[in-house]
Amino acid sequence: MTTYLEFIQQNEERDGVRFSWNVWPSSRLEATRMVVPVAALFTPLKERPDSPPIQYEPVLCSRTTCRAVLNPLCQVDYRAKLWACNFCYQRNQFPPSYAGISELNQPAELLPQFSSIEYVVLRGPQMPLIFLYVVDTCMEDEDLQALKESMQMSLSLLPPTALVGLITFGRMVQVHELGCEGISKSYVFRGTKDLSAKQLQEMLGLSKVPVTQATRGPQVQQPPPSNRFLQPVQKIDMNLTDLLGELQRDPWPVPQGKRPLRSSGVALSIAVGLLECTFPNTGARIMMFIGGPATQGPGMVVGDELKTPIRSWHDIDKDNAKYVKKGTKHFEALANRAATTGHVIDIYACALDQTGLLEMKCCPNLTGGYMVMGDSFNTSLFKQTFQRVFTKDMHGQFKMGFGGTLEIKTSREIKISGAIGPCVSLNSKGPCVSENEIGTGGTCQWKICGLSPTTTLAIYFEVVNQHNAPIPQGGRGAIQFVTQYQHSSGQRRIRVTTIARNWADAQTQIQNIAASFDQEAAAILMARLAIYRAETEEGPDVLRWLDRQLIRLCQKFGEYHKDDPSSFRFSETFSLYPQFMFHLRRSSFLQVFNNSPDESSYYRHHFMRQDLTQSLIMIQPILYAYSFSGPPEPVLLDSSSILADRILLMDTFFQILIYHGETIAQWRKSGYQDMPEYENFRHLLQAPVDDAQEILHSRFPMPRYIDTEHGGSQARFLLSKVNPSQTHNNMYAWGQESGAPILTDDVSLQVFMDHLKKLAVSSAA
């Protein structure tokens, strides 16, 4: 008999799904009392090297309002060649190609191990991938040079049939014609005036690519359609490499005390319009590189006077940021246009000051694009991260999907409340759509323009079965996720994941439901909800909501005597959940103090799209200790773990930090590691560096690497994350363990837990 932990892990590996509850309460009333909703973290393109895609199309239910895909949960009559849909119970005839099936000769989609299966659609033309580079030229020469080299490197990684385009901008916006031999030609637009797609079409003389009539069977490889601005790499590789090499800083003079005039808003608008006019509904990436904030035209985020700083959270709270609303509105309109036509927008922002990510965040957030933030294009952080965008799988294809749509089908006792993640609604109302919206709701279909193997959506459900309508003993609820997308090879693919979970009566089987709780998934699902609310609500209100939910969960599932906090017990399946909430409350996702609006937008962007493992690291960083007393070991994220004779390695997802304790730091300063008799000390210093390199080489985006020591200025990154169990207030308490006192007024986990128990057991609550 597998344990729940094994069951959860197997499901995640096979289907890319983690549910908050793995046994579902059988009535609406009981489900609302569970506090944490029935919800799932779903990774549509979860990598599964063991199951290659199958070269035929899925069999669909014949009922027009259902159209669910044949799956292992369907009942099959092999003699009559019929199958019953497990969602609407419609009886369907198998297509003629299934004539040879029997109990001993089953198609893959009926085998339980293929609860997730990927089909290749053989109809329709194979479209080329499109990459449109949008480059800011208002930056220092060495930054621009490094960026040009990175872009030239990326050209060498693109498939020869991929179409590429180039737009550069500063005070003006230039759309470069790439088909010209021996001459550079470009169309120049004013950076202060926005253009509609229609105006752009007329000015550039563009036409839409005709989509050829879909035909069955393999396609004869036709040359990819193109125009003067988007050309196949194989044709213009040398030309474009030379053109990038010749790119100069924006020639307009910048007076002293002024910022350069930068037209980011118009440049992105032209990029969106260009693709909209020529390649709607074809996989395309707009890759925008910016070295500072937009200072003119639509989408500007700050004026050109250097004495006026760019907005802070304080300015926004005091309604003293005059460009925020207008700028955000401009970029939201562009994001929605790009999402409608299925195009991805990436933003690579490298500058020492803010660049306007707060206003632009909707572009990557709604289109599934990447957001990368760094200090300079001339750092390994940017160069390595950008190179990883073009990572390839074992078949030599990019690990990116384009133009995805996710459709969810449910059995009749459960409905869909909504999704939180890098998606937009397709407004598809159906029988399985709930009235109660959470996140992007009111639909059972979403568009995800850009997908990677780790792109993860949070999907929230509502149990709608009435209290007085019992579900038959042994009944199961089913959910089907159907993801259609354009593979980087140009093929259309459909991935279908069908899962089922048992129902239980919460009045008689509450133990079964409690035992099925997945506290890690629940913590991330509640965190996404809290961060989603934080975008529109006041910070303290969100924290109060989070606390209230936690107290209610403790009251529902804790064991205690009324008004006796010391009697409170939480079972193992819930014991880590309060700790996750404690670290979430202190995290940069909900605490904006000490972060710029751009930094907050950047952190939230990544949390809203990463899978469970990475999201947990973001909430509760991992801490490893290295010492002479044994091999490296994970230790508590607590100030008591900071000891003089230890080296600590902390992984926060965004940073990898190595911290040397006081004694270790003194030995290192004295150079003991260079003496042959202290070789073991040299090995001790090297061990965390090797482990850090392993993480740095695999993560996207590449984390910031920090090497610090006791008393070092950057030790603050560690001190701000650990639980302050020792502070300046209690460091001299009798019997206090050794460790580093933290100078903070924040409450410790112990105080937080004591307070939580007191509130949970209170009869007044």
From Swiss-Prot:
Gene3D superfamilies: beta-sandwich domain of Sec23/24, Sec23/Sec24 helical domain, Severin, von Willebrand factor, type A domain, Zn-finger domain of Sec23/24. GO terms for biological process: COPII-coated vesicle cargo loading; intracellular protein transport. The modification N-acetylthreonine is found at residue 2. It comes from the Eukaryota. Its main location: membrane. Keywords: Acetylation, Cytoplasm, Cytoplasmic vesicle, Endoplasmic reticulum, ER-Golgi transport, Membrane, Metal-binding, Phosphoprotein, Protein transport, Transport, Zinc. It is found in: Cytoplasmic vesicle, COPII-coated vesicle membrane; Endoplasmic reticulum membrane; Cytoplasm, Cytosol. The modification Phosphothreonine is found at residue 308. One of its GO terms (cellular component) is endoplasmic reticulum membrane. It is a peripheral membrane protein. The keyword Amino-acid biosynthesis does not apply. Zn(2+) binds at residues 61, 66, 85, 88. GO terms for molecular function: GTPase activator activity; zinc ion binding. The keyword Transcription regulation does not apply. Gelsolin-like repeats lie at residues 632-718. Belongs to the SEC23/SEC24 family. SEC23 subfamily. Component of the coat protein complex II (COPII) which promotes the formation of transport vesicles from the endoplasmic reticulum (ER). The coat has two main functions, the physical deformation of the endoplasmic reticulum membrane into vesicles and the selection of cargo molecules for their transport to the Golgi complex. Required for the translocation of insulin-induced glucose transporter SLC2A4/GLUT4 to the cell membrane. COPII is composed of at least five proteins: the Sec23/24 complex, the Sec13/31 complex and Sar1. Interacts with SEC23IP. Interacts with HTR4. Interacts with SEC16A. Interacts with SLC6A4. Interacts (as part of the Sec23/24 complex) with SEC22B; recruits SEC22B into COPII-coated vesicles and allows the transport of this cargo from the endoplasmic reticulum to the Golgi. Interacts (via Gelsolin-like repeat) with MIA2 and MIA3; specifically involved in the transport of large cargos like the collagen COL7A1. Interacts with DDHD1. Interacts with TMEM39A. The Gelsolin-like repeat mediates interaction with proteins containing PPP motifs that include MIA2, MIA3 but also SEC31A. These interactions are probably competitive. This is Protein transport protein Sec23A. It comes from Pongo abelii (Sumatran orangutan). The gene is SEC23A.
